[in-house]
Amino acid sequence: MKLAYWMYAGPAHIGVLRVSSSFKNVHAIMHAPLGDDYFNVMRSMLERERDFTPVTASIVDRHVLARGSQEKVVENITRKNKEETPDLILLTPTCTSSILQEDLHNFVESALAKPVQIDEHADHKVTQQSALSSVSPLLPLEENTLIVSELDKKLSPSSKLHINMPNICIPEGEGEGEQTKNSIFVKSATLTNLSEEELLNQEHHTKTRNHSDVILADVNHYRVNELQAADRTLEQIVRYYISQAQKQNCLNITKTAKPSVNIIGIFTLGFHNQHDCRELKRLFNDLGIQINEIIPEGGNVHNLKKLPQAWFNFVPYREIGLMTAMYLKSEFNMPYVAITPMGLIDTAACIRSICKIITTQLLNQTATVQEPSKFIYPKATSLEQTNILETSQKETILKDNPDSGNTLSTTVEEIETLFNKYIDQQTRFVSQAAWFSRSIDCQNLTGKKAVVFGDATHSAAMTKLLAREMGIKVSCAGTYCKHDADWFREQVSGFCDQVLITDDHTQVGDMIAQLEPAAIFGTQMERHVGKRLDIPCGVISAPVHIQNFPLGYRPFLGYEGTNQIADLVYNSFNLGMEDHLLQIFGGHDSENNSSIATHLNTNNAINLAPGYLPEGEGSSRTSNVVSTISSEKKAIVWSPEGLAELNKVPGFVRGKVKRNTEKYALQKNCSMITVEVMYAAKEALSA
């Protein structure tokens, strides 16, 4: 634990709540003091959904500290089970409430042992006589109103609209036509036809019923952050329900007839996760692969037992889902793909990895003589269709003609050829990023410096994309996922000048200020740093604010995601002389662009204070790194000729030229910056 002004990854309980609120009909109870219960507000603000966040805070106050927490926690679990009837209730403490060192496992067991009281004030038994005397108000009946019997109720229009209409009791000896049409009260038929024993059984079923599943999040809140806790919680839930199905002997591990996949790791508050999920669905549909399950977003916990039926698992983000995929791999020998399809090269590598898994699965199915397998490409891919030979056909061929042992290998080669054709078609004719990277507009970005920072998945993928596909020099690539530092270094090795592994945003800001890149690609915090330093920033990773939860379709994965990234990269850089031309001809933002020049022209000679910073750079630790003047405790004087020459520099690079000249003057111990010093600084920098 540490006290921080701002954090990239939040505390562990935030990750637990993100996973629980992603599932359908799962409720989370957070055992926490006031101040830790901000998740509801945060999710309601960022995720533009209609449903309420299914999280309840069991507040730890002075009364709880005096009496103990068990009574309140058990009461909240029982109450939510009665009100919400969820499939699963997930209990989690926070790092603050964990200090109490309470036995929450015992709380869960106590809640499971306690029956659910539906009506705590019902102390009398419902008898048949009381049921017969129950009446319900009803509007006057028209002559053409149908008398609906219990048998026909399912077919009535009112039942289709889920209207709870009581049936009308017709006295013995009277027909339907003799029913009084102006009845104001009729007897309710809900309990009329039940015997006394059935009434008692119904009363017992109403007052007590089985509990929802209750799980205590198995997370060390002192040692893991938000992302690690989310990964662990998802694996815990999957393991719980698969183990439950194994104990009940209802776990079906038979593979689906056609290739299928589980997408693991799409969850709430993720960076463009909803859009990425749609793009992945389209990608797998083009490849002829069915979606078996998507977890946790929109998933049902009772469907988790179907996970082993898929041919393989796909983990788009390393931050969540990798532990679940590894568990399914160890338990059921299910292969998984963890290559993020971000950029043309990585997307092609991901598809080839999927192709390898599918062909391997087909070989295994043929060896074990399972059900006949077929693999058909849809027409949407514009590729020729192919059918895998059925197992019985292969056996007949091999028996009748021993020399035809290459039939299966030929079929596998055909599948690989089709996958390669799909990659080629998407890269050359569908995706716009390939030809754009060879256009003159993108070539103008070649050699420009950029800094990339974010989570391990997006930062590594973005670094490789910029270096390999767009020719941009990545001066520094970094991540705040310190637990995945080794993998990150391996991925970005050879694609950047230096690597930064830290979760301290001030270090990232200092590094950006020292490198002075042409653009930044990072999180919401890097956007703030870019605004202070007047450096454009493109957001490519969580944590982000509401503007990066767009309503429109903006994926970052797949071929459409590559188009979006190309637009983001190009629009993040300053477009050449645009700012300078706007300043010359009086554009809409010429006032801002000429701010430095206006300030310099107000005085013929300016004695800059030690803490002076150009406009747009606030008094922060990051901004202080921009100029070494403050650290050297020296004052620099600009001559009138030097100021006039500096004013001739285009506005969009004037601040950078000014800082470089001042650094050179400090190194050479020049007390006044003249025109000669400026040109000497330029030559030294060019060399």
Curated annotation (Swiss-Prot):
Q: According to the lineage, what is the superkingdom?
A: Eukaryota
Query: Which residues does the record give as substrate binding sites?
Result: G576, M577
Cite the GO molecular-function annotations of the record: 4 iron, 4 sulfur cluster binding; ATP binding; metal ion binding; oxidoreductase activity, acting on iron-sulfur proteins as donors; oxidoreductase activity, acting on the CH-CH group of donors, iron-sulfur protein as acceptor
Q: In which pathway does it act?
A: Porphyrin-containing compound metabolism; chlorophyll biosynthesis (light-independent)
Name the chemical reaction catalysed here.
chlorophyllide a + oxidized 2[4Fe-4S]-[ferredoxin] + 2 ADP + 2 phosphate = protochlorophyllide a + reduced 2[4Fe-4S]-[ferredoxin] + 2 ATP + 2 H2O
Q: Which residues form the active site?
A: D441 (proton donor)
Positions of [4Fe-4S] cluster binding: D36
Which EC main class describes this enzyme? oxidoreductase
- Tagged with keyword Plastid: yes
Any single biological process term in GO: light-independent chlorophyll biosynthetic process
UniProt keyword terms in alphabetical order: 4Fe-4S, ATP-binding, Chlorophyll biosynthesis, Chloroplast, Iron, Iron-sulfur, Metal-binding, Nucleotide-binding, Oxidoreductase, Photosynthesis, Plastid
UniProt cross-references to SUPFAM superfamilies, sorted A to Z: Helical backbone' metal receptor (SSF53807)
What does the record note about the cofactor? Binds 1 [4Fe-4S] cluster per heterodimer. The cluster is bound at the heterodimer interface by residues from both subunits.
| Subcellular location field | Plastid, Chloroplast
Q: Which InterPro entries match?
A: ChlB/BchB/BchZ, LI-POR_suB-like_C, Nase/OxRdtase_comp1, P-CP_red_C, Protochl_reductB
Which is one Pfam family of this protein?
PCP_red
Gene Ontology cellular component list: chloroplast
What's the family? Belongs to the ChlB/BchB/BchZ family.
Q: What does this protein do?
A: Component of the dark-operative protochlorophyllide reductase (DPOR) that uses Mg-ATP and reduced ferredoxin to reduce ring D of protochlorophyllide (Pchlide) to form chlorophyllide a (Chlide). This reaction is light-independent. The NB-protein (ChlN-ChlB) is the catalytic component of the complex.
Q: How does it assemble?
A: Protochlorophyllide reductase is composed of three subunits; ChlL, ChlN and ChlB. Forms a heterotetramer of two ChlB and two ChlN subunits.
Cited HAMAP family: ChlB_BchB
Q: In its UniProt entry, what is this protein called?
A: Light-independent protochlorophyllide reductase subunit B
Please name the source species: Chlamydomonas reinhardtii (Chlamydomonas smithii)
